[in-house]
């Protein structure tokens, strides 16, 4: 069952969260997949919903973070989040390159397929 507090603050839909939970991946692998999917959804939001092209650059990531009401309460978290976005971006760009698509074209299904093929 999906915690309502998590769902209301997540950029992932309930069906996307369920899709991740329904995989036969370990708890750690599902967590990693959720983090990547969460970052991908944030990147798409930063790109104003574009579904193709490169991931937003560091400057656009910072602007997006500063515009988030939930981050305005704890701006000391923004550098940590930007570091996490940078790490996720590297991983997402690698997956996109392997699939021959742009990073913003990635979908949750692509990420699930990549993780399950590694196991």
Which ranges hold each PLM region?
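Surface-exposed, Lys/Arg-rich phosphate-binding patches that contact polyanionic backbones
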Residues: 20-53, 85-105
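Short Lys/Arg-rich basic patches
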Residues: 2-40, 59-84
């Amino acid at each position: 069952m999906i915690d309502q507090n998590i769902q209301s603050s997540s950029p992932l839909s309930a069906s996307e969260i369920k899709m991740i939970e329904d995989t036969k991946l370990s708890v750690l692998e599902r967590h990693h997949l959720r983090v990547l999917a969460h970052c991908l959804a944030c990147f798409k939001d930063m790109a104003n919903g574009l579904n193709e092209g490169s991931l937003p650059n560091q400057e656009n990531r910072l602007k997006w973070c500063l515009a988030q009401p939930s981050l305005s309460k704890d701006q000391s978290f923004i550098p940590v989040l930007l570091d996490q976005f940078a790490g996720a971006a590297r991983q997402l760009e690698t997956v996109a390159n392997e699939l021959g698509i742009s990073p913003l074209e990635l979908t949750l299904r692509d990420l699930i397929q990549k993780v399950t093929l590694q196991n």
